[in-house]
């Protein structure tokens, strides 16, 4: 959600919004608004002074208050979900569908060409036969402000990339990268499953999608986009028939016994004794100047940001 929020609040000339509306008048529609992603998006937009939610679509909850589904919104608004999708009345529409459903929706429905689309699923994150901009503001801020179609990055992908991008940009990623990351249960979506029940998740930790998580595609894509031509290629091991020459991101995701947030550890080997100062990194969201050696998982819950801490060990 950081990426959406940052894109909307970027200053632009003549009092206009980077998404195409005017200050105090950006009209927004939301599809798939009853899920966890839709609920968090509604919370952010309700508190945004430049946004009006024109409709939030959910056929199964049409007529129900937002707070009937997203209880944390009780008292914040009296708006209801709708079955209608009046695209001609909005400047931008958010897709909060499950993965794979955005592309299918666009094949079956017509959205006016002047309406901007922000897709929160993974359908358009990988470059291909489309014009969607990958919505990581630390590297694509100007493109985001100008684009018509935006693909919001994945949760793991955002966390992992922001730690690695300064090193990639400096050409320092020359060895395989080890990543371990723990995610909360809401990352699995609202629909209950065997691995999301409290009785299974509480006081438990488990590995899933070992070295095969789908976010590897977008991580490798961005690292290769930023690295100098002389730096090793980052191999996307999920691609069929990939060539092994280059370096890999060895990513092990874990299910944690908490609801929200991601805690990530990235281990890289640097051939040069070089440290990247926060000011040298892509336009990011700061460092941790208080001297703490580790961020806390609870620190970032409900916030549009993250902590990055760099620890290093010198081998002689």
Briefly describe each language-model feature range.
Residues 14, 118, 290:
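Residue-level hotspots at or immediately adjacent to binding/recognition sites across diverse folds
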Residues 2-11, 25-210, 229-231, 242-244:
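N-terminal Rossmann-like NAD(P) cofactor-binding subdomain of oxidoreductases
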Residues 187-234, 239-273, 303-316:
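Charged docking surfaces used in two-component/phosphorelay signaling
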């Amino acid at each position: 959600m950081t990426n959406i929020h940052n894109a909307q609040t970027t200053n632009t000339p003549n009092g206009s919004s980077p998404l195409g509306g005017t200050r105090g008048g950006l009209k927004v529609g939301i599809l798939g608004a009853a899920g966890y992603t839709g609920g968090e998006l509604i919370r952010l937009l309700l508190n945004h002074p430049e946004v009006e939610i024109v409709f939030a679509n959910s056929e199964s909850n049409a007529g129900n208050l937002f707070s009937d589904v997203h209880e944390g919104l009780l008292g914040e608004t009296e708006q209801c979900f709708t079955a209608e999708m009046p695209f001609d009345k909005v400047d931008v529409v958010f897709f909060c569908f499950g993965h794979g459903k955005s592309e299918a929706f666009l094949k079956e429905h017509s959205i006016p060409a002047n309406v901007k689309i922000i897709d929160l699923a993974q359908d358009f994150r990988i470059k291909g036969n489309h014009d969607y901009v990958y919505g990581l503001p630390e590297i694509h801020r100007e493109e985001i402000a100008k684009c018509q179609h935006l693909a919001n990055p994945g949760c793991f992908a955002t966390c992992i990339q922001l730690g690695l991008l300064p090193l990639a940009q400096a050409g320092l990623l020359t060895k395989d990268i080890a990543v371990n990351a723990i995610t909360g249960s809401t990352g699995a979506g609202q629909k209950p499953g065997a691995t999301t029940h409290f009785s299974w998740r509480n006081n438990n930790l488990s590995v899933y999608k070992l070295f095969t998580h789908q976010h590897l595609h977008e991580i490798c894509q961005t690292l290769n986009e930023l690295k100098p031509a002389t730096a090793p290629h980052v191999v996307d091991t999920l691609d069929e028939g990939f060539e092994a020459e280059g370096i890999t991101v060895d990513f092990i995701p874990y299910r944690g016994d908490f609801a929200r947030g991601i805690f990530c550890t990235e281990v890289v080997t640097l051939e040069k004794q070089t440290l990247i100062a926060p000011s040298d990194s892509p336009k990011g969201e700061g460092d941790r100047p208080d001297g703490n050696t580790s961020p806390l998982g609870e620190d970032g819950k409900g916030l549009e940001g993250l902590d990055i801490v760099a620890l290093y060990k010198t081998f002689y």
